[in-house]
A protein has these predicted regions:
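Glycine/charge-rich, flexible interdomain linkers and switch-proximal surface loops
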Residues: 1, 32-35, 61-65, 81-85, ...
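Long, charge-dense, solvent-exposed interaction surfaces that engage phosphate-rich ligands
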Residues: 18-72
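Amphipathic, well-ordered alpha-helical segments in soluble domains
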Residues: 14-18, 40-43, 47, 105, ...
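Long, amphipathic alpha-helical coiled-coil segments characteristic
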Residues: 32, 83-118
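C-terminal non-catalytic interaction appendages of large macromolecular assemblies
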Residues: 102, 106-168
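Short, small-residue-biased leader/transition segments that mark boundaries at the very start
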Residues: 2-8
């Protein structure tokens, strides 16, 4: 009987050690996962920065296309009215707001990932909002170089969404 009690105690101790090792492993795995997620957030922001040089050229190309189309019509145009219409059209295609919101979402993602209560669901919701901004940028872009960068952002975001499912 004495030996049996010792055996139970040994078993309890072994289970306790196993649980401690499991907890340590999960903590290490979580740190690696968060580091990977943050690296992907950095990539998304880097791709967003790469969009900037294409924006001015895109706007100028739109203006040139409109002027060229009008020249082909060979009609007199009120230049003030033309400028107003071009500004209106170009503003509809402006992606500044989306870039600002994407930056805010990336910062919030980092903040939540660094917090003690890092919640996978919350990170998932933030990633979903990031996706909306990236998609809107893509639909407004009307530029192949920007589209390529948007696809790269989407690729990173998909990997983030998959990994976030592994966070409790």
């Amino acid at each position: 009987r004495r030996q049996r009690q010792m055996s139970i105690r040994d078993r309890m101790e072994a289970v306790g050690q196993a649980l401690a090792h499991l907890d340590e492993f999960r903590t290490q795995e979580g740190a690696i996962l968060i580091a990977d997620l943050l690296k992907r957030i950095d990539r998304i922001e880097a791709y967003k920065q790469e969009v900037i040089p294409f924006e001015k050229a895109r706007t100028e190309a739109i203006r040139a296309r409109i002027r060229e189309s009008l020249a082909q019509l060979q009609t007199e145009v009120d230049n003030n009215r033309l400028e107003q219409e071009m500004i209106f059209y170009i503003e509809k295609l402006d992606i500044t707001e989306e870039k600002v919101r994407l930056t805010n979402h990336c910062n919030y993602f980092r903040e939540v990932a660094a917090s003690e209560e890092c919640a996978g669901r919350k990170l998932g919701f933030i990633a979903q909002e990031m996706g909306r901004e990236i998609n809107t940028m893509g639909s407004k872009a009307n530029n192949s170089e920007i589209q390529i960068l948007v696809v790269k952002m989407k690729d990173e975001l998909e990997k983030i969404k998959e990994q976030v499912l592994n966070i409790l």
